[in-house]
Regions:
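Glycine-biased, low-complexity coil/linker segments
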Residues: 220-223
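Mature, structured domains enriched in cysteine- and short glycine motifs
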Residues: 1-213
């Protein structure tokens, strides 16, 4: 039976059999039987890690160990509020720091601690009292590559890629639409959106990069807006 540890762009955790390409950590959220409690984080240091690193192996949801979470890809991890791990994804983390400094107008040589980034992100990704995701409003064409948005009806999650958007599922991206000028609900935290604007390009699942998504509108047909 699948465990409830697959993360959506809305930051929620679901039990599905689809595999992810990144693993996440928010602390210990499960009991000794591997069942999630009510907590959805235990600390503000939310990271996204490689699935394999230096031959290390760990049982999933082991007793008294952090809860392994899984994301379809990096864009989903960012939408849920997770930054690159500074150990197993060192190069991605360094690129992230460069873009974070640029987005905030900081000197390239300025000292930047992961704890400072995590503190800033935690204020933007979730309401601590209600545990609901914090979202923004923006015009769709103004958003950079890799930003997740919610589109009605149904409030499906879509990711921006150049002039199109792709619909997310746990298994991959299954549909594309041309981008139109329309106000949307942005799921990706504000600071992450600015990091994307500053040049960090998140890696998407092969279903997007290989062009596996199929168009929901014929060429020249009506898209959003």
């Amino acid at each position: 039976m699948p465990r409830q540890n697959r993360v959506t762009p809305f930051g929620t955790l679901e039990a599905v059999s689809a595999r992810g390409t990144l693993m996440g950590n928010r602390g210990i959220m499960h009991d000794v039987n591997g069942v999630l409690g009510t907590a959805r984080w235990q600390h503000p240091h939310w990271i996204a890690c490689r699935l394999a690193f230096k031959g290390r192996w760990r049982p999933i949801m082991a007793a008294r160990s952090w809860t392994e979470l899984f994301f379809l890809d990096e864009a989903v991890a960012f939408a849920a509020g997770h930054r690159p791990c500074a150990e197993c994804r060192r190069e991605d983390y360094r690129r992230f720091l460069v873009a974070w400094r640029a987005a905030r107008g900081l000197p390239a040589s300025s000292k930047l601690l992961a704890t400072d980034i995590d503190r800033a992100l935690h204020k933007e990704r979730v309401e601590s009292r209600t545990r609901t995701q914090i979202t923004l409003k923006a015009n769709l064409p103004d958003l950079p590559y890799g930003t997740f948005v919610a589109i009605p009806p149904g409030r499906d999650a879509w990711v921006t890629i150049e002039t199109d958007i792709l619909r997310w599922t746990h298994a991959g991206y299954d549909r594309s639409r041309p981008m139109h000028a329309v106000d949307v609900e942005v799921l990706t935290p504000r600071s992450i959106v600015e990091v994307f604007r500053a040049g960090y390009r998140p890696k998407l699942h092969p279903s997007a990069e290989a062009g596996a998504a199929t168009s929901s509108h014929p060429k020249g047909g009506r898209g959003l807006g």
